[in-house]
């Protein structure tokens, strides 16, 4: 159980440290989505289908089939981007909820150190505590966040994958 516990703790720390990167990734994907939608508006042909399968695929496709293939690829890419954005937003919301469930001081310590990358001693000075006390409270808070994210109501760790 100890190895699982450490894995969950490490994963929780990674989610917190990557929080700003996740925000940035969503912004990049939103821009890619807008670009693909603009490109889709230029491809005016609806996808051609023969039976249940998309048409084309041979080296001698017609213009309509090439446009249909392009449209299909763009729509698949758009769907993947939407899925990725949804997954990141779900992870971010889970992390936000777990951190906000902490006591205000613990929330501040965790957010400042792991998300904002503020050193323990700077947080300690601001809170008028020793660096060791802040570090200890931070580690305890991370354990609580990990428990909130990964432990089910029966008290056992769930086999959950937040980011595939």
Predicted regions and their residues:
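N-terminal interaction/assembly modules
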Residues: 1-98, 147-164
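A short hydrophobic/aromatic micro-motif that marks alpha-helical segments and, especially, helix-coil
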Residues: 38, 118-120, 145
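Short amphipathic alpha helix immediately N-terminal
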Residues: 101-118
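Helix-turn-helix DNA-binding module
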Residues: 116-133
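DNA major-groove recognition helices of helix-turn-helix
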Residues: 95, 134-148
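Short, well-structured alpha-helical interface segments that form or flank functional binding sites
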Residues: 14, 24, 90, 105, ...
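Juxtamembrane/interface motifs at transmembrane-helix termini
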Residues: 129-132, 144, 155-157
């Amino acid at each position: 159980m100890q190895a699982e516990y450490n894995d969950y703790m490490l994963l929780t720390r990674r989610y917190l440290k990557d929080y700003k990167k996740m925000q940035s990734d969503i912004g990049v994907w939103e821009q890619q989505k807008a670009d693909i939608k603009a490109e889709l508006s230029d491809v005016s042909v609806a996808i051609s289908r023969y039976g249940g399968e998309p048409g084309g695929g041979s080296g001698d496709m017609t213009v309509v089939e090439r446009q249909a293939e392009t449209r299909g690829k763009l729509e698949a890419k758009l769907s993947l981007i939407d899925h990725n954005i949804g997954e990141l937003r779900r992870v971010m919301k889970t992390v936000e909820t777990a951190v906000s469930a902490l006591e205000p001081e613990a929330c501040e310590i965790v957010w400042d150190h792991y998300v904002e990358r503020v050193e323990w001693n700077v947080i300690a000075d601001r809170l008028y505590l020793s660096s060791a006390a802040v570090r200890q409270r931070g580690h305890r808070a991370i354990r609580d966040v990990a428990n909130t994210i990964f432990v089910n109501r029966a008290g056992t760790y769930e086999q959950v994958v937040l980011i595939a």
